[in-house]
A protein has these predicted regions:
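Key residue(s) within conserved catalytic/signature motifs
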Residues: 32, 47, 51, 135, ...
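A generic structural signal for alpha->beta connector loops
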Residues: 166, 202-203
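Conserved P-loop NTPase-based nucleic-acid remodeling module centered on helicase motor cores
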Residues: 1-46, 50, 188-191, 195, ...
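Charged, glycine/proline-rich intrinsically disordered loops and linkers
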Residues: 51-84
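Short, conserved catalytic or interaction motifs in soluble domains
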Residues: 43, 50, 62, 143, ...
Length: 204
């Protein structure tokens, strides 16, 4: 919403480093890109540090790509440019998140990530829910994000039967009706359901 955009714009303004690779973006585009990357990270429970490390490794590989007539190919140059932009955006995402902490702001994605951490760190949370509900039905499963799928697995599945493996969980969904990819939904969760929620024997 507008409030998120204002916080992101303020984070961009407060960022101390020059933005060499993002200078082509307009004052409106830059906060929008920050929010988009922040949302993508949250939906996959990835940290800026993890994506930065991956991006640097990818950059090193592209720099070693074969040359064409003594120069990098157009595709390689475009890939390097995209990586450099992402590295600067990651800096801005970190500034945005620090600003939110200073302002005491919490978004839905933050609550979602905290819920995953809670479920992973305290098995009693999942155990309590499994005692409360006899079965679980996950409707429109194609519209769940990776983070939401991880949360559900932490609550209603596990390494053994005492931690939830084999708990009666049913998912209903159609990958052809997936319409929320723009907000992190991953229709691939349907394909992974049999292994994410195996039978008590461990079989899909």
């Amino acid at each position: 919403g507008a409030s998120r955009f204002r916080v992101a714009a303020r984070a961009v303004a407060e960022h101390p480093l020059p933005l060499e690779h993002l200078s082509r973006l307009s004052p409106r585009q830059l906060p929008e890109r920050v929010l988009a990357l922040d949302a993508a990270l949250e939906s996959h429970l990835a940290t800026p540090a993890q994506v930065r490390e991956f991006s640097l490794r990818a950059r090193a590989r592209f720099e070693k790509a074969p040359l064409w007539r003594g120069s990098p190919t157009k595709a390689v140059l475009e890939a390097l440019g995209a990586i450099d932009e992402r590295l600067e955006l990651l800096e801005l995402v970190e500034t945005y998140r620090e600003l939110k902490r200073r302002l005491g702001l919490v978004e839905f994605a933050d609550q979602q990530a905290q819920a995953v951490e809670l479920a992973r760190s305290f098995p009693v949370v999942g155990a309590t829910l499994r005692q409360r509900f006899r079965v679980v039905l996950l409707d429109e499963y194609q519209d769940t994000s990776s983070a939401q799928a991880i949360l559900l697995r932490a609550l209603f599945s596990g390494a053994d039967t005492t931690s939830g493996r084999g708990f009666p969980v049913t998912a209903v969904g159609d990958p052809n009706q997936a319409i929320y990819g723009w907000r992190g939904a991953a229709a691939s969760n349907i394909l992974g359901f049999p292994t994410h929620f195996p039978r008590a024997t461990g079989e899909p």
